[in-house]
């Protein structure tokens, strides 16, 4: 059949076409399982602007299976390589230069790229055998091919998009950081976790009393979400009953947090100096004109600071240097946004442009600060992962 590539001559032809650029879609053993718990069944490759794609079987009964390293050689020789989810691709092939078109779409359109790979045959098999780990081995390879063709037709226009500022930071640095962060998983007490969190099917992302998470990077501010198998790991309830479901795979869980993080990040942007003491307490001492701050005063100061950053600066304190600088910074950002049509976030260079809906100065500063927080944390995580590479301590979860 023309679309199945098995012979060396066809593989060599595909390798020659790689100089035109390739789109790749990996078919895993089960679409519902975490990619770390799945294997590679086949690979769909489509030369850019070709009228059809090709499917190369790796572990499917209907094909003369091709070694993965042979396919890696073809993909790595592409002048440009596009995929719908680079982080998932990394579980099958270490292709650092791949361009994530879902990320590209989210950075250009400020929205999520929607696509479906369903067809009647896939629906039939998944309705009956969804829990079977190797379900995609059972589905006729022609139907797997059809589903990949369907996805390509829905996303092909994104390949033509111009790469925006900041794309490499998220496509390479962020994608690698969160891919590596997913490798450890979080230790759990299996029965307690299953009872409290009711995952759709625990088999989809649990192994050896460890649950695997999955970060989604395709958000307006680039703040990652982290939900998989009906469990939101970015918003684990703080009740003792929920927290007791987790166990360290080593000796202890250690939680690290930043003091007055957004306040400090914004102070850096406006060149306002805060000491190493509690950021909120430093301003509380000014508000209440005293050196010793009680708990209620601290909470009030924290609320005031939050409103000053993301809402309206209280008139009572508008004269303070930090707030005059914040006001000037917000006005400057908004002026650049209005005049130039976009502003670039610090560190990542991510653009916030006219494609955003219902923008105003407060919304813009909110987006910029969330982006700054995320990009700074990505760099911190990158260094932490590098430091812990040969250590027993593992990073297991990122929240904000």
Task: List where the protein language model places each region.
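Short Gly/Ser/Thr- and Asp/Glu-enriched loop/turn motifs at secondary-structure junctions
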Residues: 100, 172, 192, 300-302, ...
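Acidic two-metal-ion nuclease catalytic site recognized across multiple nuclease folds
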Residues: 167-176, 196
């Amino acid at each position: 059949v023309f679309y199945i590539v098995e012979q060396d001559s066809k593989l060599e032809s595909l390798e020659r076409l790689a100089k035109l650029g390739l789109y790749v879609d990996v078919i895993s053993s089960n679409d519902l399982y975490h990619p770390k718990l799945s294997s590679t069944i086949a690979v769909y490759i489509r030369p850019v602007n070709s009228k059809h794609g090709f499917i190369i079987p790796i572990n499917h009964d209907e094909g003369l299976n091709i070694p993965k390293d042979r396919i890696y050689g073809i993909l790595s020789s592409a002048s440009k390589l596009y995929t719908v989810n680079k982080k998932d691709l990394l579980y099958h092939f270490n292709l650092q230069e791949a361009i994530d078109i879902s990320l590209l779409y989210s950075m250009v359109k400020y929205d999520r790229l929607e696509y479906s790979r369903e067809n009647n045959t896939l629906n039939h098999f998944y309705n009956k055998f969804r829990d079977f780990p190797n379900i995609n081995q059972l589905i006729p390879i022609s139907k797997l091919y059809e589903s990949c063709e369907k996805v390509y037709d829905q996303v092909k226009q994104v390949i033509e998009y111009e790469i925006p500022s900041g794309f490499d930071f998220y496509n390479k640095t962020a994608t690698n950081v969160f891919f590596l962060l997913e490798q450890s998983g979080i230790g759990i007490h299996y029965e307690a976790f299953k009872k409290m969190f009711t995952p759709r099917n625990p088999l989809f992302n649990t192994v050896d009393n460890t649950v695997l998470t999955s970060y989604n990077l395709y958000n307006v501010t680039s703040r990652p979400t982290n939900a998989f198998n009906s469990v939101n790991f970015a918003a684990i309830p703080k009740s003792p009953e929920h927290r007791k479901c987790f166990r360290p795979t080593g000796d202890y869980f250690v939680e690290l947090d930043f003091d007055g993080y957004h306040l400090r990040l914004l102070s850096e942007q406006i060149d306002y100096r805060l000491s190493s003491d509690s950021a909120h307490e430093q301003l509380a001492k000014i508000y209440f004109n005293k050196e010793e701050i009680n708990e209620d005063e601290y909470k009030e100061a924290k609320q005031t600071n939050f409103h000053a950053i993301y809402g309206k600066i209280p008139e009572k304190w508008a004269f303070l240097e930090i707030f005059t600088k914040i006001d000037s910074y917000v006005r400057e950002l908004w002026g650049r946004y209005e005049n130039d049509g976009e502003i670039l976030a610090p560190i990542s260079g991510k653009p916030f442009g006219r494609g955003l809906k219902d923008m105003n100065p407060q919304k813009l500063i909110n987006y910029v600060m969330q982006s700054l927080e995320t990009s700074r944390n990505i760099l911190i995580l990158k260094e932490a992962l590098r430091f812990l590479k040969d250590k027993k301590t593992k990073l297991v979860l990122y929240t904000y």
